[in-house]
Design a protein with these regions (language model features):
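Sec-dependent N-terminal signal peptides
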Residues: 4-15
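Bacterial Sec-dependent signal peptides at the C-terminal "C-region" and cleavage site
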Residues: 16-22
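Positively charged n-region of N-terminal signal peptides that target proteins for export
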Residues: 1-4, 19
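Extended soluble regions of mature proteins
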Residues: 22-199
Length: 199
């Protein structure tokens, strides 16, 4: 069940990122940002998302507690791959083909908005009005699994439930079009990454 909800969360991240402005066909509608999040539900904690080049480079750092276990982790998407590792266990990590690239390429060959809406429909989630969070007017996407708020392709809030598992994430601050240090997108050379299948 945990694996299923993690897969859904990754899909929601990727799909919200795929809602970029049609003119630029990039993951997000703004060039750069630093966003702080809190997590709730079965996993609690905090996270910080850094991105540049309209999301073509992104890094998410999380410190969370789940079932009494504390964990730290980086998820860095840059180029063809998305890499994940725990800074406290730097010997090995995981990587997968960056799902955004194929989805963006597919979207650019057809009707962009229809593609995004169809992708959400497959998850049973549909656009449902607007809500404001941190001064940003967000699209509301709802379904049986829960609700997501999206602004310029950026996930601002998420509430999901699957079986007895719940997952929440909410932006607590956002700085847009700021300078993001390149160090956040560097993959450590001392880590051996095992490749996992993509979507």
């Amino acid at each position: 069940m945990k694996k299923s909800i993690v897969t859904v969360v990754i899909l929601v991240y990727a799909l919200t990122a795929a809602q970029a402005q049609e003119q630029i066909l990039k993951p997000y509608g703004i060039k750069s940002a630093i966003i702080e999040y809190t997590y709730s539900g079965d996993k609690t904690g905090t996270g910080t998302l850094y991105f540049d080049d309209y999301g073509m480079k992104s890094a998410l750092y999380m410190e969370t507690i789940m079932e009494g276990e504390e964990s730290k982790g980086w998820v860095v998407a840059f180029g063809d791959y998305q890499s994940m590792w725990d800074p406290d266990q730097p010997d090995d990590g995981m990587k997968m083909k960056n799902p955004l690239l194929s989805w963006i390429n597919e979207a650019s060959n057809g009707d962009y908005e229809s593609f995004t809406e169809e992708a959400y429909k497959k998850m049973g989630m549909f656009k449902s009005g607007k809500e404001t969070l941190l001064g940003k007017e967000c699209d509301v996407i709802k379904g049986d699994m829960g609700k997501v708020l999206v602004w310029n392709g950026i996930m601002m809030m998420m509430e999901l439930k699957m079986g007895g598992y719940s997952s929440g994430q909410k932006a607590t601050s956002i700085k847009t079009n700021v300078a993001v240090e390149p160090k956040y997108f560097i993959i450590p050379k001392n880590i051996t990454f095992s490749e996992m299948p993509g979507f």
